[in-house]
């Protein structure tokens, strides 16, 4: 059973998506963690020095997706 799971999906420009990824990367590099704000809930997660990263690309005839998962 999950203690907490936050999920959000929204449409944005490619540039906005790149900015979001940069913000996450900067937070991981500088602050050793990430912070999420979702429906008035603020959650901070500490991230250890070593993590597992999974990158998955899927292309279909009508849609493609890129998933990046970081776990520890």
Please place each PLM-identified region on the residue numbering.
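Extracellular/virion structural assembly segments
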Residues: 23-30, 34-37, 41
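Terminal, regulation- and interaction-focused segments at domain boundaries
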Residues: 1-19, 23-26
């Amino acid at each position: 059973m999950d203690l907490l799971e936050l999920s959000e999906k929204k449409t944005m420009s490619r540039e906005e998506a790149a900015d979001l990824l940069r913000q996450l990367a900067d937070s991981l590099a500088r602050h050793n963690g990430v912070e999420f704000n979702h429906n008035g809930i603020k959650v901070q997660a500490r991230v250890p020095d070593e993590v597992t990263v999974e990158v998955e690309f899927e292309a279909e005839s009508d849609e493609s997706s890129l998933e990046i998962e970081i776990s520890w």
